[in-house]
Amino acid sequence: MIKILLVEDDKIIVASLSEYLNSEGYLVRSVSGQAAAMKLLAEEKADLVLLDVSLAEGNGFAACRAIKAEFDVPVIFLTASGDEFSTVTGFDLGADDYIPKPFRPRELISRIRNVLRLTGLS
């Protein structure tokens, strides 16, 4: 089973996204910030990280930089900010995809599958 780490501080998004991803056959663990994400990744292997750009604890760009420096795991940004600067910054930091909110659930699943396929995990 594919394990996804969801790094998101909005509890409503965590609940709805976790439920949807679980129904699609993914095992989801969630944390609300960079420190917790780094700790969980060190303790448990994740196959993919879904990462919000705006976190109450730090920011997603710094989290992506830290995750990519220490772990070999694909990262998909989820963000309400779909501006060009944010998108380019995300990709420059090593993000594998960038999905603006609100997103369509089926598109999210397609993008997850695509990233997993490109990294050899599906």
Regions found by a protein language model. Name each.
Residues 1-121:
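N-terminal/domain-start alpha-helical segments
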